[in-house]
């Protein structure tokens, strides 16, 4: 009589928050799959549902609690992890029947909780997992986390209390992971960390052997190594330290994309001081000018906080004037929101909500004007574009070097019947609006 093999439990996953949390989810699922667990995208088919939460601001916490509530209603067997897991009592008050709660980066605790909730009889099946691990992004791009935590103590932020101080990964381990991703079809590597430009500080910029040379735990050396793998390399969360200047020649060489995501947060010296952000806004403008002298087409993205406690109309106007000079390609903005545990909560000079909203609108209007002018200047030019979507009716959408997934603009193509997701093609730009480009593929 043939013995029937046991059926492996199925795990569902809801991943919320930033790309760094997405990488955490990928790591957890890779581990569980390697042990033989199956994965399910349906609540009613899963034996256990994992909810990886965000706990940075109140709106994100509410979104996480809503997701937990949905998982409880649709399935009932739920394990919570991620940043909101640090507030276990709050979660238990609303959902007393949660199976287990763990905090951010507590990978072993999550896996152990799954073992308790849905024991698996099979032996580990490492061959069930592709060499590059499991991914939650499309095949053609991947987030590559190079560090965890942050050494800064910005007054509006609680990341260090959620994720700890800076912990950098070994340079050789990062390059090995990136090489596997590229071999598996990744065309674009999105480098992330809480503070990517601080990479390697905790390792004292130690050198590691990578193939036939030594690679330093330093963002510039690491970026060079990544650029040699043949994929697009896009740098995110780059704090504007002086050594960031060393990345610009790599862009000029074509090793990494001419794109930097730099969270300036504000420009007014008084606001930056209260935020505990040491950047000098005048020197930053000088550096942007020098970067553009080396790489004229460099795309610069940043995010800003409006309505920070004590922000005056003069401070805000300073920011708008600074944006006129900086001419950033992509801008995101957030209305200040008190975060439990942040020092800024105790600051005087709270800005009324209606003023925050009005300033937010003015900032985004300014950013849109700048963006539209810069995109209009690209009409008639040919740009490389990576394809993200096809519509089956001859249309396609993708992104240029100046566009990160989900947060920046897109390039919309006509007559794109022969294009596939992940293709990198040359597009002639025919039109533009405030955020997107429109054109036709030449190759």
UniProtKB/Swiss-Prot annotation:
A molecular function GO annotation: 4 iron, 4 sulfur cluster binding
Domain Radical SAM core: 136-373
Catalyzed reactions per annotation: L-aspartate(89)-[ribosomal protein uS12]-hydrogen + (sulfur carrier)-SH + AH2 + 2 S-adenosyl-L-methionine = 3-methylsulfanyl-L-aspartate(89)-[ribosomal protein uS12]-hydrogen + (sulfur carrier)-H + 5'-deoxyadenosine + L-methionine + A + S-adenosyl-L-homocysteine + 2 H(+)
Family: Belongs to the methylthiotransferase family. RimO subfamily.
Keyword terms of this UniProt record: 4Fe-4S, Cytoplasm, Iron, Iron-sulfur, Metal-binding, S-adenosyl-L-methionine, Transferase
Enzyme Commission code: 2.8.4.4
Swiss-Prot/TrEMBL cofactor(s): [4Fe-4S] cluster
Name of the featured protein: Ribosomal protein uS12 methylthiotransferase RimO
Naturally occurring in which organism (per UniProt): Zymomonas mobilis subsp. mobilis (strain ATCC 31821 / ZM4 / CP4)
